[in-house]
Amino acid sequence: MTDSAKPQNPDPGHESRRVAPLAGSPRSPFLIEFPEDSFTAVFLGREKRFLVEAERNGHLFQAHCNNSGSMLGLLRPGSDILLSVSPNPSRRLPYTLESIKLGSHWVGVNTLVPNRILRLAWDRGILPELIGYDRFQNEKTSGESRLDAFAEGPAGQVWIEAKNVTLVEDDVACFPDAVTVRGQKHMRELTALARAGRRAACFFLVQRPDASCFAPADFIDPVYAELFHAAVHAGVEIWPYEAVVTRQGIALGRRLKVVGH
């Protein structure tokens, strides 16, 4: 039994600097860099929805998992995982699950990453879809939904929702990996914006390297898939991008084609 209130230091004798994942320097290929105090451990199980059990150097401890999806195909006991250390010394669980090793590559599971990558890519000017937008706002309310981003500038205005993708089936990156009522709501709002003549987009960050294209997971959430197709028909833009996830950090990779619509 592990102690969830006072997790043991998985690396005895090591004093953590408690630095959260950082924005990469302008010369770095990474948009997000993991600090030196991030560390690997062995995944043991998912105790609760937002809690994972891990082991390092013979010590059992718990870590926070902000991914509410099923993470289908990733939660294999014995797999290596990468954990970051919270800069908040009073947080009950100081460690956050960032990625899981699947075979020879890492899969990013932190659902806050797509929003950060979107903004950092805009800031560096490396996302073609956001060229001509010189103002960027995280989280903006539209109708009854709060969307992840809003950008405006000489090119106009664009509303954006960002999603994390970890599921790949037969070389196809698929979203979602579990039924998502919240995701359905966001897609409806994007569709309403597009039908009102506004530019709207959904940014899907595929945090693994083994997909050649992207499609909605109709075999998991047929309602979301139907809404996805209706959104595309209404003019909502789909931006699926591969993330290059390593032990050191995360970079923005190639854009994937959308299939099945």
From Swiss-Prot:
InterPro entries named among the record's database cross-references: SfsA, SfsA_C, SfsA_N
CDD domains assigned: SfsA-like_bacterial (cd22359)
Region (Disordered) location: 1-23
Alphabetized GO MF terms: DNA binding
Organism superkingdom: Bacteria
UniProt-listed Gene3D superfamilies: 2.40.50.580, 3.40.1350.60
UniProt similarity note: Belongs to the SfsA family.
PANTHER family (alphabetical): SUGAR FERMENTATION STIMULATION PROTEIN A
Name of the molecule in the record: Sugar fermentation stimulation protein homolog
Upper taxonomic lineage: Bacteria, Pseudomonadati, Thermodesulfobacteriota, Syntrophobacteria, Syntrophobacterales
Designated gene of the protein: sfsA
